[in-house]
Amino acid sequence: VKAGNIGVAGNIAVIGGGNTAMDAARLAKRSGAERVTLVYRRTRKYMPADEHELALALADGVEFAELAAPVKQADGVLTCEKMVLGEADASGRRSPVGSGEFFHIPCDLVISAVGEQVDDALMAANGIELDKKGRPAFQTNVEGVYAAGDAKRGPATVVEGIADAAAFAEAVIGTAHTY
């Protein structure tokens, strides 16, 4: 990816604050996206990503929308609720609490990198249908929205995640890739 553009363009929002989110954001930026915004419901201080990964994302030009919880994506816009930090949870991190205020991020593609569980509320808010196991299809019923990795399969192996990533790249970019 460092050597060339693989065809990603426009504004991309990556949801999450861990190492996977940092990797997805950096890859999108290096692949030709005009603007990549990492959306996280807490502040950078509470991001689970390694400091090194965070520094690399910043160096690559990834923008950060902190204290932001996505609620809807439609017509090229990601609507987020502004969050405030409340009391600490079991992990020791202060829990995000909705403020009732909303803002918008221009976005042509959303990449959700928030863990192994499907966010049912986010899926429902965006009209994404789930199967009987509570998982979305690879190419969901919403045009331009794909599910891959743990969101599609549940907890799985790295090899399965890489296979899903290759299928996603082929679907979005239109070119088969081998890894």
What kind of region is each of these model predictions?
Residues 76-78, 136, 145:
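Hydrophobic residues embedded in beta-strands of well-ordered beta-sheets
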Residues 22, 26, 68, 108-112, ...:
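Feature representing long, continuous alpha-helical segments
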Residues 15, 107, 113-114, 141, ...:
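Short, well-ordered coil/turn residues at beta-beta hairpins
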Residues 17, 40-43, 150:
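Cofactor-binding loop segments of dinucleotide-utilizing enzymes, especially the Rossmann-like FAD-
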Residues 1-9, 30-132:
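A Rossmann-like FAD-binding core segment of flavoenzymes
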Residues 1-31, 130-143:
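Glycine-rich dinucleotide-binding loop and its adjacent helix/turn
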Residues 24, 148-179:
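A conserved FAD-binding loop/helix module that cradles the flavin
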